[in-house]
Amino acid sequence: MSDEFYYGTGRRKSAVARTRLYKGNGRILVNDRPFEEYFPRPTLLAIVRQALALTKLEGRLDVKVNVAGGGMTGQAEAVRHGISRALCILDPELRGVLKKAGLLTRDSREKERKKYGQRGARARFQYSKR
């Protein structure tokens, strides 16, 4: 990998992905492992590839990602968000395509907290009439 890179930070739920794009031949490393090995499900692989496929840069860039926190899906979506942001820095012309696909928007949905006096965030304790 060359020294010049483009940086982007992606977030989803509690996952944070720090992404670097290098000129290369399409290799994607997540936490120093090939992404096919790190994300075992085909749906997650598709999520990670989505931004590169949309911009037709799949075989031309190497991606190096450090991701922490959250679960597998949250991490995959954080990686996608980070790659999308880095692509905007690489080529500002791509912003419109990525924005239209919704890849630059931070998905702000978070887990709602459990409230006291209840079983969960919304669920109440069972009510007994008698």
Swiss-Prot record:
Keywords: Ribonucleoprotein, Ribosomal protein. HAMAP family: Ribosomal_uS9_B. GO terms for molecular function: RNA binding; structural constituent of ribosome. One of its GO terms (biological process) is translation. Belongs to the universal ribosomal protein uS9 family. It comes from Solidesulfovibrio magneticus (strain ATCC 700980 / DSM 13731 / RS-1) (Desulfovibrio magneticus). This is Small ribosomal subunit protein uS9. GO terms for cellular component: cytosolic small ribosomal subunit. It holds the Pfam family Ribosomal_S9. InterPro entries: Ribosomal_Su5_D2-typ_SF (IPR020568), Ribosomal_uS9 (IPR000754), Ribosomal_uS9_bac/plastid (IPR023035), Ribosomal_uS9_CS (IPR020574), Ribsml_uS5_D2-typ_fold_subgr (IPR014721). Residues 108-130 are annotated as: Disordered.
